[in-house]
Amino acid sequence: NNTGVDIMAIPFFSIDFKMSEWSSIFSVFLGFSSRSKQEKKLLELLHNRFPEKKITLFPSARMAFYFVLKNTFKTGDEVIFPAMGFPLYVKIALQLGLKPVYVDVEDEHFTIDVEQLGTAITANTKGIVVTHLFGYPCNMDEVMKVSNKYDIPVIEDCAQSYDSFYKEKETGTFGYAGIFSC
């Protein structure tokens, strides 16, 4: 290189999967029957893990969130969101004609600030979305107190909290709906 510009070599990494791992990866891209087998396995695992819950699989957490919002709220309803979360969920709410209301997050784990949650409730508030961010559960005791006091459903965004627990109870099992992603 005679341009006087240093060029960094981009390292090449080998992806070293076992044959069984490649088989699993490729089965996702094969026909419906292969996916159907994988879906059945996943449903069985989830039913064993959450025996008291109704499980529905979606192609993405976004689609699940859309489905829950569309079938739970109506145009003009206010839904509380944490100020820090997945921005696309707010966009989905807006597309459905819902009115997002933001509640700030607490300083330690950046989950919804439960001290501010109660003051954000109005007569038009019809839902609360909480995000268990970075594997840290929200203070679900306080969230559910507000939910029960005002009879408002809680939707838990658990995309970052699979296998996380709040006081020995798994995230996604407190509210009206828990949405996981893998």
Segments and roles (model prediction):
Residues 56, 80, 101, 153-155, ...:
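Structural detector of well-ordered beta-strand residues that form the stable sheet scaffold
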Residues 68-120:
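Conserved PLP-anchoring active-site segment centered on the Schiff-base-forming lysine
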Residues 52-54, 58, 105-108, 168:
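Short, acidic/glycine-rich phosphate-metal binding loop used to engage nucleotide
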Residues 45, 55, 71, 92-96, ...:
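Alpha-helical structural signal in soluble globular domains
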Residues 57-58, 81, 127-130:
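A short beta-strand submotif of the Rossmann-like class I SAM-dependent methyltransferase core
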Residues 1-67, 71, 148:
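Conserved PLP-binding active-site segment in aminotransferase class I/II-type PLP enzymes
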Residues 108-181:
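Active-site phosphate-binding strand-loop segment of PLP-dependent enzymes
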Residues 60, 84, 133:
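Flexible loop residues that form catalytic
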